Amino acid sequence: MAASSEEETDRRPIRRVRSKSDTPYLAEVRISLNLETAEEVERLAAMRSDSLVPGTHTPPIRRRSKFATLGRLFKPWKWRKKKSEKFKQTSAALERKISMRQSREELIKRGVLKEMYDKDGDLHNEEGLMENGQAVSSGSSSLPIITELELTSMAGDTCAYEVLPTSELMDGTVSEDLSSEPGSLSQDPSYKPAMLLPPKKTVGFPVDQEDTPVKQITLLKQPPALPPKPISRIANHIADSGAPVKLPCMPGKMSPPLPPKKVMICMPLGGTDFPYGPYSNQKSSQHHHTVLPSQLAAHQLQYGSQHFSTGSSSISIHPSIPPGCRVIEELNKTLAMTMQRLESSGLHGGESITKSGLSGYCDMRQVPTVVIECEDDKENVPHETSYDDSSCLYSRDEEEDDDDDDDDEDDDSSLYTNSLALKVLRKDSLAIKLSNRPSKRELEEKNILPMQTDEERLESRQQIGTKLTRRLSQRPTAEELEQRNILKPRNEQEEQEEKREIKRRLTRKLSQRPTVEELREKKILISFSDYVELADAQDYDRRADKPWTRLTAADKAAIRKELNEFKSTEMEVHELSRHLTRFHRP
């Protein structure tokens, strides 16, 4: 029975299945033919191998493609696996770091974070925590009411960074004194909160050789703030009001670190002092140092330390200078020198204008200023007169020459106006130089030009005339030149004879010129392009297919006859191949 079943399976026609080169061919064959053992599969593969004679039932043998070995070398599916492994590793490391992060309560217990108190003494819990330099927001989008920066000084005094409302900034009324003690929070719901950028790091300034605990910066919870606008945009809002504007100071990376009581003093844009009466007296009496916004921007570019955002926040720094801050004074001096060097190229011409009385080109106007107030530590401040004298070394009356626009066209307009002003300055300086040119009388008075009367001028001219006539009289005449054989005497007849002689000589040369045939005989002219022959011809219609251009039957017969004669007589052909020559029909 078993033998008969095997014969039956052998007699069945072999199905056309996948080729032998494919990997899962054994499983498919086993499923399709209901084979159970491996021996039967191998036997079937041997029947379907190359040694099998292809008959009616055997499928055609497939050839392996030339790209079959490419998978051994080029395996791009493994690259994705490597990338996914890297992503898994980084995600696992991030999850591990997040799980190891401590909560806010633990940081408060350890003393890293400090709880904030209201004015009444109630505990005010923070809602936002600074993580990795950005404020973490947990669903609520309330703006920060106030931001306080507490810094430790030598005597424990603080420098409070307060926020002014935008309504006061727009009206131009800014309170000059501090509204609250440093360290306290003002939570007044009447005014509009100000937007502030989140700082990159919490900053604690080191104290000179003291182990006092460093207070951390505390920030209320806030959404991601918009990028700050340039400082020059506030100028048009507060240009008419005479009140000084308190610009903000954002905490950031301090390099180099400055003590909190140091007054940042920058050189002004203008190179000369412009005393303006009551405004300058008011500033000197209040011990205020003004800093222009362009200088603040230059200071920010140079040190990269203090980020001034143009929201409606204010800075109030105690200007009492500790005795051990010589290094920072030197830094401020170098800052002032660099600012003066940068601004001197475009503003050194302005001094000449003011000296010559052309003061109409400068638009003197009041500008927004940073007010640095003096409150505490008054015993370290020197006397009023000496303080004013020392501040005059670094602070001067700043006035802007150009108006700034509200939009992003501020820089372009300032550049345009600066270039226009420089152009006008160049023209005016040229006019001034021409107007300052000394007259002839001044030159004569300075003995640069000799003093001459009219008679002396006439005498000098007569002397020059006599010299010229003497030189012309010394010139040789034509007779003298003829005697020296330099100038030959000529008559008209002689000149005409000379011209005739030249004509004869030329005609003789042209008549003796050889013709083309003579040159061909002498083999001087080799190719036809060496000479040109002219022939007279009548104009005719050069278009073809005319009745007189068509060949008639007689013309064609004559042409055939001429060709046959040429082939029979003039074409030299071997006698053995003469029978192969084709002649045209007559």
Curated annotation (Swiss-Prot):
Return the annotated region ranges for Disordered. 373-414
Q: Where in the cell is it found?
A: Cytoplasm; Synapse; Nucleus
Molecular function (GO) terms for this protein are: actin binding; protein phosphatase inhibitor activity
Which residue ranges does the UniProt annotation give for the motif Nuclear localization signal?
A: 62-83
Keyword DNA repair listed? The answer is no
Pfam families documented for this protein: RPEL (PF02755)
User: Gene Ontology cellular component?
Assistant: cytosol; nucleus; synapse
**Keyword Nucleus on this protein?**
yes
Predominant location category = cytoplasm
Q: Which UniProt keywords apply?
A: Actin-binding, Cytoplasm, Nucleus, Protein phosphatase inhibitor, Repeat, Synapse
Q: What is this protein's function per UniProt?
A: Binds actin monomers (G actin) and plays a role in the reorganization of the actin cytoskeleton and in formation of actin stress fibers.
The name this protein carries in UniProt is Phosphatase and actin regulator 1
Give the classification, highest ranks: Eukaryota, Metazoa, Chordata, Craniata, Vertebrata
